[in-house]
């Protein structure tokens, strides 16, 4: 595609702006780093967790969307860096319309997809809390339905938002949304943000219900304690994860909207303003890195508390001896390898 000389000069000024260059390198590094804790948590923690199948399905889909977003940003930022290194002509810095449209779709799709899942988690957790004593036996139907609905709804919204865009403006960043679609995207971001704020209100109520559930643990039978303890711990994890996600997304939306509409009030140079606006998009990959690390850490604490609760549930008599015996051999197995011994927990 042929571009005007002015478009190529503009592309050169934007591509080699120091702020834009810094955002590219930071985005590449943080996206790369975020993939490892996310995949680690998915494969070695979440997939092996004792969460109910409905909640696990939603969480797996949520973390897969985060991994996909980080991989997308890693690919686009690396491509932008390579183009700035190997380009011999100013016009070579401009991204072709077709790849720009494809990667821009993926960026928006995975960005917004992850913001739908907190609402799904809240719906699932309310159902779990209302049926806590028998939820363990509930069929795994709600989770897949909520995930399928989220994916389909988000796909239709993003597809209709971008389907008529030609992407012929000549941009140097895959994250840049065409002017007409940008207004729709920002409106969509704000709507999602306020929906998530409403979700926070329900999550606070859910947290209060969860505290009441914790009190029930003291006066429940051993069999019921196991079920209630799992609902309590998984709900606690869910609420904190949702709150962190919404805070991060709120910061992202605020930064993007502020620098788009008010950035010129504090940054007069348009090239530097463009660089700052692209830098604000690195908030989400940074969140992905933090949430992957946080989830693994929180899960470790949850496991330790669950082990402690298991021992405390029965600490006297024959069952108490079995619990103590199992705990000792669990520690021994973790140090010296597996031992062929059957320990029954009563």
From Swiss-Prot:
Belongs to the nematode receptor-like protein srb family. Keywords: Membrane, Transmembrane, Transmembrane helix. GO terms for molecular function: transmembrane signaling receptor activity. It holds the Pfam family 7TM_GPCR_Srb. One of its GO terms (biological process) is sensory perception of chemical stimulus. GO terms for cellular component: membrane. It is found in: Membrane. This is Serpentine receptor class beta-11. The keyword Repressor does not apply. InterPro entries: 7TM_GPCR_serpentine_rcpt_Srb. It comes from Caenorhabditis elegans. The chain crosses the membrane at residues 26-46, 57-77, 102-122, 139-159, 186-206, 239-259, 278-298. SUPFAM superfamilies: Family A G protein-coupled receptor-like. It comes from the Eukaryota.
